[in-house]
């Protein structure tokens, strides 16, 4: 059941209209780092960041800006309500935990058994060469609680990577974003699929044949991953958690890419040998 506080904020259109302003009378920030935007500014941010991230899918700052600009006035409120409708989601909203190197001990995670959630997470971080402190702070979402929901989504993103095994290469990111879109309906995750146009022919073929069917099937069928209290799952068996959430582990993309590179190299060497004789 939604709380009175939730009911007062459920209608995003009424809230946005009641906060109308111009660049000449910009209101005070609602939380540290908040930047209130006019409708025109938000639209410009959405278009600019969408074009920029399509040109360079590795620009995490542009992808973050696109996520915030397109999440309001409806989608982030919907995701917040998904959390409010779930006991664990409500606890997350109440406690507002953060995932970073200050709250998660990497040494502790490395000491866990190999098939635990925490060990799977830190092994994925080590393999991909990333850390838990790379997520930008939310700036452009007006509602403080909804800003936290977006921040939580960002900080949990690497856990989604870890339990699926998908790498941070563009091909892996698109596959995971497609899963996230089916599961969260955040527009930025859906728009990320346009980056398929920048993939190599063999990568495009893998996306349409392997990643897209897996992402849609699992994103729609699995439980809302935003409601997972990852900090409380670290010592659990990762296969058990996948089963509970209803997530099938996809094919090992890193291994597929490695095999393809090896086959390509062998074909090139064979061609050189044939020319020589």
Swiss-Prot record:
Q: Which cofactor does it need?
A: Zn(2+)
What would be one Gene Ontology cellular-component term for the protein? extrinsic component of mitochondrial inner membrane
* Lineage top rank: taxon: Eukaryota
Please tell me where Zn(2+) binds in this chain: 157-158, 161, 173
The pathway to which it is assigned is: Cofactor biosynthesis; ubiquinone biosynthesis
Q: Where is the transit peptide?
A: 1-14
What is the membrane topology here? Peripheral membrane protein
- Reaction(s) catalysed (UniProt annotation): a 4-hydroxy-3-methoxy-5-(all-trans-polyprenyl)benzoate + H(+) = a 2-methoxy-6-(all-trans-polyprenyl)phenol + CO2
Free-text function comment from the UniProt entry: Lyase that catalyzes the C1-decarboxylation of 4-hydroxy-3-methoxy-5-(all-trans-polyprenyl)benzoic acid into 2-methoxy-6-(all-trans-polyprenyl)phenol during ubiquinone biosynthesis.
Q: What's the name of the protein? A: Ubiquinone biosynthesis protein COQ4, mitochondrial
